[in-house]
């Protein structure tokens, strides 16, 4: 501590300072003179400084105060106001002086302040026991809805999945499907009620073979249906349905109940046909008069 700061504060203790300086010199047995540096202060100033330090030490002993550092610095030995470094070993500043014990007896150091209390385990906030007991509810194990903050942002804003930095890298970022939580019932594809199959398409070869079979016989037997289905790589049901549709189409086009293959054919021994044939031949061969 500099003497320029101490002397104005303790200027009224001049008599006490002189007495304290004399007592300190008598106790030390010899004058305290530094060997390797000089404080360049007058004797009166040095005496005042020593007295001020002694009074400061006594006042500190009477009124202890908390020091910001855990280890307080002891006061320097009296007789030098030049500002030597504080520390327990002050004798290395005064190698030619007498015993440093006498100097410390003249100016006793302030007592060690009590250690500061340990910080609370809750980071400076007083804890009131367990949270379940303090808040009055059981400590439930809650699982986070989203693992990261990015996923939460994607769910809140599904259309902005890509950040502004990589929009150019992914031009189709707006066409990406939204999250399942944003799927509404009207967005889902509506399935057709019932068990309805699609329209069966036939190749040209299959259609040609079925037409030939229809002209030969519009009604297929079970045996012939199996053969046609194996030949055309179709099922029996598909062949059956095709023949049903073809018969309905023919009836609609011709307005007749009979099919070409089921027309009545004249038998070989039919007398009516023979008689009619003879009449026609006679009419042609016998000219009328």
Curated annotation (Swiss-Prot):
GO MF, one example: DNA-binding transcription activator activity, RNA polymerase II-specific
User: Where is the protein situated, by its record's location annotation?
Assistant: Nucleus
* InterPro entries for the chain: Antp_homeobox_TF (IPR050948), HD (IPR001356), HD_metazoa (IPR020479), Homeobox_Antennapedia_CS (IPR001827), Homeobox_CS (IPR017970), Homeodomain-like_sf (IPR009057)
Xref: Pfam families: Homeodomain
Q: Which residues bind DNA?
A: 195-254
The principal localisation class reads nucleus
rRNA-binding among the record's keywords?
A: no
The residue ranges flagged as biased composition, category Pro residues, are 107-122
Stretches for region Disordered: 62-125, 162-184, 252-289
CDD domains annotated for this entry? Answer: homeodomain
A Gene Ontology cellular-component term: nucleus
**Recorded family membership:** Belongs to the Antp homeobox family.
Q: What does this protein do?
A: Sequence-specific transcription factor which is part of a developmental regulatory system that provides cells with specific positional identities on the anterior-posterior axis.
Protein name (Swiss-Prot/TrEMBL): Homeobox protein Hox-D8
Natural source organism: Mus musculus
Report the gene name. Answer: Hoxd8
């Amino acid at each position: 501590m500099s003497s320029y700061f101490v002397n104005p504060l303790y200027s009224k203790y001049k008599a006490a300072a002189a007495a304290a300086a004399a007592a300190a010199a008598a106790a030390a047995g010899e004058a305290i003179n530094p060997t390797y540096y000089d404080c360049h202060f007058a004797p009166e100033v040095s005496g005042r400084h020593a007295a001020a330090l002694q009074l400061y030490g006594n006042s500190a002993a009477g009124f202890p105060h908390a020091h910001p550092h855990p280890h307080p610095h002891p006061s320097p030995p009296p007789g030098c106001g030049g500002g030597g470094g504080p520390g327990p070993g002050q004798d290395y500043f005064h190698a030619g002086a007498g015993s440093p014990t006498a100097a410390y007896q003249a100016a006793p150091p302030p007592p060690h302040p009590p250690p500061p209390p340990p910080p609370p385990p809750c980071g400076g906030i007083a804890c009131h026991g367990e949270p379940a007991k303090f808040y009055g509810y059981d400590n439930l194990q809650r699982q986070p809805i989203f693992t990261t903050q990015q996923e939460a942002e994607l769910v809140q804003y599904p259309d902005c999945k890509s950040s502004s930095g990589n929009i150019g890298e992914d031009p189709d970022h707006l066409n990406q499907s939204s999250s399942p939580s944003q799927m509404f019932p009207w967005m889902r594809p509506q399935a057709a009620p019932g068990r309805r199959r699609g329209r069966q398409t036939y190749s040209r070869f299959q259609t040609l073979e079925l037409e030939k079979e229809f002209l030969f016989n519009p009604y297929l037997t079970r045996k012939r249906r199996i053969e046609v289905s194996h030949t055309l790589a179709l099922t029996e049901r598909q062949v059956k349905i095709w023949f049903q549709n073809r018969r309905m189409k023919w009836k609609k086009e011709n307005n007749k109940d009979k099919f070409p293959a089921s027309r009545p054919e004249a038998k070989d021994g039919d007398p009516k046909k023979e008689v009619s044939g003879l009449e026609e031949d006679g009419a042609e061969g016998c000219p009328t008069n």
